[in-house]
């Protein structure tokens, strides 16, 4: 098995390798893991404690400006095309979001061709942003509050209804982020919406493993990525930690069992 591994926001290949070592020690020794550096410089506006994060580090993108997300996606897709084939993709945090985006885009653009991966593994992953759902244009009012305007894309997720974009699950995360740093941004800003499981016409038919911590401090790390996938082909577990890999031996063993069961199901 050969896996493409994607790190999270303000992470590095080296840090992800270190975090994966306890779990890969429980997997077959002849499996291969290839790591891709994200490439964009993180910003303190997204991560206030960035100065304490070990360097080097990088992100796939910062705020979901359409051009930045598209650049990250195209770079990843080009890498898979040139360096593949890979048997699986394994994404942590924002890397998991990018892995899900890659599969969703394949489903949308090449529905009648084989997926680029036989399986996918997600650790502490969250929903990716969509190129099809349009953008929210956020602007500041005279009262220094954020006002959203929805510009639909190929898909109108509002279905003609007036939605509270400050609370809607497509956009609430981004609202909270930019509202916290609105005095340091230039407005207006146009940001992509996130995919929701209800947005896709059918579940992704790729065997998958989903792992998250019960103490994850990011509320948006939930079951949503799991819900994008065919439940008959998906396996999931939780562990006692937070926004990281399982650390207790019995949890690592269970994680490894889920991965191996998924690999066996491919044959």
From Swiss-Prot:
Class of this enzyme: hydrolase
Pathway recorded for this protein: Mycotoxin biosynthesis
Biotechnological relevance of this protein: Fusaric acid is phytotoxic to plants such as cotton and banana. It has been shown to induce programmed cell death in plants. In addition to a mild toxicity to animals, fusaric acid exhibits acanthamoebicidal, antioomycete, and antimycobacterial activities.
Keyword vocabulary terms for this entry: Hydrolase
The EC number(s) this enzyme carries: 3.1.-.-
One Pfam family it belongs to: FSH1
Gene deletion effect: Impairs the production of fusaric acid.
Induction: Expression is positively regulated by the secondary metabolism regulator LAE1.
Residues the record marks as active site: 93 (charge relay system), 183 (charge relay system), 243 (charge relay system)
Molecular function as annotated in GO: hydrolase activity
Top-level taxon of the source organism: Eukaryota
GO biological process terms, semicolon-separated: secondary metabolic process
Recorded GO CC terms: cytoplasm; nucleus
Database matches in InterPro entries: AB_hydrolase_fold (IPR029058), FSH-like_dom (IPR005645), LovG (IPR050593)
Protein's job: Hydrolase; part of the gene cluster that mediates the biosynthesis of fusaric acid, a mycotoxin with low to moderate toxicity to animals and humans, but with high phytotoxic properties. L-aspartate is suggested as fusaric acid amino acid precursor that is activated and further processed to O-acetyl-L-homoserine by cluster enzymes aspartate kinase FUB3 and homoserine O-acetyltransferase FUB5, as well as enzymes of the primary metabolism.
Family: Belongs to the AB hydrolase 3 family.
Record protein name field: Hydrolase FUB4
